Every structure is written in C-alpha cells, then in structure tokens.
C-alpha cells in the first residue's frame, strides 16, 4: 500500500544516559532523502561504489547504512557477520576491505580499539591490498585520540570521527 512521505518509518529512542530516553520519529520521505544525500555529500560514495557499514543491523546506523542508504543510492553494500577480531583473527576487516574493494568503512571506534589491542603493529593489515580504500568513518561512541591516531598511522588515509542525531 502506498505511503505518504510524512508517514512514520520508525521511532528511534536515545539511550537515556543523560536523562529519560527520548523518542525521535523518523518519517519515510525525509529519512530516505537524508540517507541518499549523505551517501554522496558526507561519505563521497557514488552509485556503483562499494560501501561497508560494519554495524549491528538492529541499530539505526545498521539498518540505515547497511540496507536503506546503499539501496537508494545504487551502491554495493557489504553485509558482514562477525567481529573485528576472532572471526578468525584481527585481520578480518582488512580481508573484507581487500576482497571486495571497499571504498569506505563506517564503524564504531570499539571495533578499531579491538583490532589495535589484538594487532598493535598492524601485521594483519600488511597482508592485504587496500589500495581501493579511501576513508574510515567512526561514530556511535567517543573515539579516543589514541585510536584515531593509530588508525591514521596504519591506514595513511583520513579517519573521520563524526556524530549523529541521538549522540548530540
């Protein structure tokens, strides 16, 4: 059945860490427009590019940037089951980026803290060709300066820490 652009898509609740949780209603049309716009204007992803949002699909970033945004923007999305370490090792993210020629990765800082802890020298990183990889985006929680610097030094690419609606 057709929907109006202002029909609710879902309600997103803040964590409540600074008070009672607050519900944010996302409308269908506005959310789709914002997601499509952000793929080009924030993430520099073009139709046909390969994008990876390494998030839980149940979180807002997960369903928004694993499913909806890539679908509406016409790019390839990576759906990954596993953790950044231990599935099978701390090179899992590098293997996926290399194997699928990922242009940009969006993940939580915790993922990179885990990789850094397991492989501080970046030995797994050196095993893979990441020549197509351009930029790392971190969000969802505080990105500590040590983790950002470690990722920048390892990747030799920009590492962007940014915030979203319920984090501000």
Predicted regions located by residue number:
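Conserved pre-ATP/AMP-binding loop-to-beta segment of ANL
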Residues: 1-13, 20, 35, 44-50, ...
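Conserved adenylate-forming
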Residues: 47-48, 82-168
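Short functional hotspots where side chains directly engage DNA or cofactors
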Residues: 14, 25
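Adenylate-forming
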Residues: 31-32
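Residue(s) in the substrate-gating loop at a strand-loop-helix junction
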Residues: 56
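Conserved short alpha-helical elements in the N-terminal third of ANL/AMP-binding
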Residues: 62-78
């Amino acid at each position: 059945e057709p929907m109006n652009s202002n029909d609710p898509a879902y309600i997103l609740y803040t964590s409540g860490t600074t008070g009672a949780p607050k519900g944010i209603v996302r409308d269908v049309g506005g959310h789709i427009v914002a997601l499509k716009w952000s793929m080009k204007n924030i993430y520099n992803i073009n139709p046909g590019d390969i994008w990876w949002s390494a998030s839980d699909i149940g979180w807002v970033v997960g369903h928004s940037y694993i499913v909806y945004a890539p679908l509406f923007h016409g790019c390839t999305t990576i759906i990954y089951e596993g953790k950044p370490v231990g599935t099978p090792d701390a090179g899992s993210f590098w293997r996926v980026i290399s194997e699928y020629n990922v242009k940009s990765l969006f993940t939580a800082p915790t993922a990179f803290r885990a990789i850094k802890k397991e492989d501080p020298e970046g030995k797994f990183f050196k095993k893979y060709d990441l020549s197509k990889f351009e930029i790392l985006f971190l969000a969802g929680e505080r990105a500590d300066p040590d983790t950002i610097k470690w990722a920048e030094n390892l990747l030799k690419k920009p590492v962007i820490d940014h915030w979203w609606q319920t984090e501000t």
